[in-house]
Amino acid sequence: MIGELVKDKILIKNIEDARLIYKMGYYGKPIGISKPKSAEEINSELILSLIEGVYLVKKGKLEIVSNGERLDFERLYQIGVTQIPRFRILYSVYEDLREKGYVVRSGIKYGADFAVYTIGPGIEHAPYLVIALDENSQISSNEILGFGRVSHSTRKELILGIVNLTNGKIRYIMFKWLKM
C-alpha cells in the first residue's frame, strides 16, 4: 500500500488501499464520510495524519512517497519533528496507546491531543481524551481544570500522557469527576 506525503498529511489515493488501511484499525479519515462504521463504506481517498503515517511505516504496513521518492521511517519522523510542534511527545503517546490496542484519533475538536477508543469511531463514543505532555513541562491547575471541564461535559475521562523523552517511558494520569 502506498501513500503520498502532502504537506503534513498522507493521501491514500487507491480506494482498495484506503479500505484496507482503515480496516486495520480505523486509521485516517475518508474524504466526504465523517465516521464510517465499516471499511466497505469507504469509496473515496483516505487522509492520514503524519503521526498515523509514520506509525504505519514503522509497522511495515505502508510505504510513503514524496516527489517519487520513498520515505523511510527515520526521514518521515524528521519531517514530523520539523512540521509539527511537540511531534516527539505526540508520536510517543500515539504509538504507546496503539501498541496497547487502543484506537487513537485526533482529539482537537475536544481541545485534547487525542480521542481514544476501545473499539472504534462510529461504533462507540470515545471514552477517553488524552493530553500528551513532556515530563519537563509545566501545566497550571487552571489548564487542568479547563481540560477537565471539556472532558466532563463530553462524558469522557481525561488522561495526561506524560513522556520522558530521555528513557522513552510514559506515565498516564487519569482524572475523574466525583459528586460529593
Swiss-Prot record:
EC number, UniProt record: 4.6.1.16
Organism: Sulfurisphaera tokodaii (strain DSM 16993 / JCM 10545 / NBRC 100140 / 7) (Sulfolobus tokodaii)
Catalysed reaction, written as an equation: pretRNA = a 3'-half-tRNA molecule with a 5'-OH end + a 5'-half-tRNA molecule with a 2',3'-cyclic phosphate end + an intron with a 2',3'-cyclic phosphate and a 5'-hydroxyl terminus
GO BP term, pick one: tRNA splicing, via endonucleolytic cleavage and ligation
Entry protein name: tRNA-splicing endonuclease
Active-site residues (renumbered): 117, 125, 156
Pfam families on file: tRNA_int_endo, tRNA_int_endo_N
Molecular function per GO: lyase activity; nucleic acid binding; tRNA-intron endonuclease activity
One GO CC annotation: cytoplasm
InterPro entries cross-referenced by the UniProt entry: tRNA_endonuc-like_dom_sf, tRNA_intron_Endo_cat-like_sf, tRNA_intron_Endonuc_cat-like, tRNA_intron_Endonuc_N, tRNA_intron_Endonuc_N_sf, tRNA_splic, tRNA_splic_arch_short
Cross-referenced NCBIfam families: endA (TIGR00324)
Subunit (UniProt): Homotetramer; although the tetramer contains four active sites, only two participate in the cleavage. Therefore, it should be considered as a dimer of dimers.
Keywords: Lyase, tRNA processing
Organism domain of life: Archaea
Function: Endonuclease that removes tRNA introns. Cleaves pre-tRNA at the 5'- and 3'-splice sites to release the intron. The products are an intron and two tRNA half-molecules bearing 2',3' cyclic phosphate and 5'-OH termini. Recognizes a pseudosymmetric substrate in which 2 bulged loops of 3 bases are separated by a stem of 4 bp.
Enzyme class: lyase
Family (UniProt): Belongs to the tRNA-intron endonuclease family. Archaeal short subfamily.
GN (gene name): endA
